[in-house]
Amino acid sequence: MSVHSKLYEGKAKILYTTDEPEVLLADFKDDATAFNAQKRGSIIGKGRINCSISSQLFQQLEASGIKTHFIDSPAPNQMRVKAVKIIPLEVVIRNIAAGSLSQQTGIELGTVLKQPLVEFYYKNDQLGDPLLTRDRLLLMELATAEQVEEITHLALQINDFLKNFWQNCGITLVDFKLEFGLDSQQQILLADEISPDTCRLWNTTEADPNRRVMDKDRFRRDLGNVEDAYQEVLQRVLTAVEIKN
């Protein structure tokens, strides 16, 4: 495979075209951003760690029947993926109250929700990625009613799988963000990444509200030891996969 030109550069990854029209190369960066890129920094080794975690989780999800854009990982910080047209929605699944849910509703941090909450946010930096109702996103024609139904179903399936997987890692899956895209056959595929950048992860055996954090909240909230937390998550993922296999 030969790499051609840069197609897109986001906050965490650069996408390149290749000599295969339906295959892209995703290069994971060490750059870190928070609060819609108002806070910027760098986490040493983040690109390699997030790519490795995402690669493992995509393969586990594929084995469970969830279709993803993942093909393979030719280098520690690179992933070959199927070219998809990204649906401009950030799909957030919440199992425990935290972050904006607690801030906007008054639900106490750490409250276990009676059932998973699926939310849709408009993927638009200029507007600040606003929370959308189902009717609004249909009005904006960001997706069809059938696609919204399928995405919701997939999101809950993925949540069921990941909750169990992270539990086997000694990690509690508080909430996480997913992105989906359409391939050339208009099939919905799970895209983007699954990593400490996109998941809120708490160490199951740690009660202290700061020490338990194993995700990008360590960067957002200046808790320190960000690299160590990311590396610990990767090690637990690799161990869980080895045991499972």
Swiss-Prot record:
Keywords: ATP-binding, Ligase, Nucleotide-binding, Purine biosynthesis
Keyword rRNA processing (UniProt): no
E.C. no: 6.3.2.6
InterPro entries named among the record's database cross-references: SAICAR_synt/ADE2_N (IPR028923), SAICAR_synt_PurC (IPR033934), SAICAR_synth (IPR001636), SAICAR_synthetase (IPR050089), SAICAR_synthetase_CS (IPR018236)
Pathway: Purine metabolism; IMP biosynthesis via de novo pathway; 5-amino-1-(5-phospho-D-ribosyl)imidazole-4-carboxamide from 5-amino-1-(5-phospho-D-ribosyl)imidazole-4-carboxylate: step 1/2
GO biological process, one term: cobalamin biosynthetic process
Gene Ontology MF term list: ATP binding; phosphoribosylaminoimidazolesuccinocarboxamide synthase activity
Tagged with keyword Transferase: no
Pfam families: SAICAR_synt
Highest taxon of source: Bacteria
CDD domains cross-referenced by the UniProt entry: SAICAR_synt_PurC (cd01415)
Catalytic reactions of this protein: 5-amino-1-(5-phospho-D-ribosyl)imidazole-4-carboxylate + L-aspartate + ATP = (2S)-2-[5-amino-1-(5-phospho-beta-D-ribosyl)imidazole-4-carboxamido]succinate + ADP + phosphate + 2 H(+)
UniProt record similarity statement: Belongs to the SAICAR synthetase family.
NCBIfam families according to UniProt: purC (TIGR00081)
Protein name in the entry: Phosphoribosylaminoimidazole-succinocarboxamide synthase
Organism: Nostoc sp. (strain PCC 7120 / SAG 25.82 / UTEX 2576)
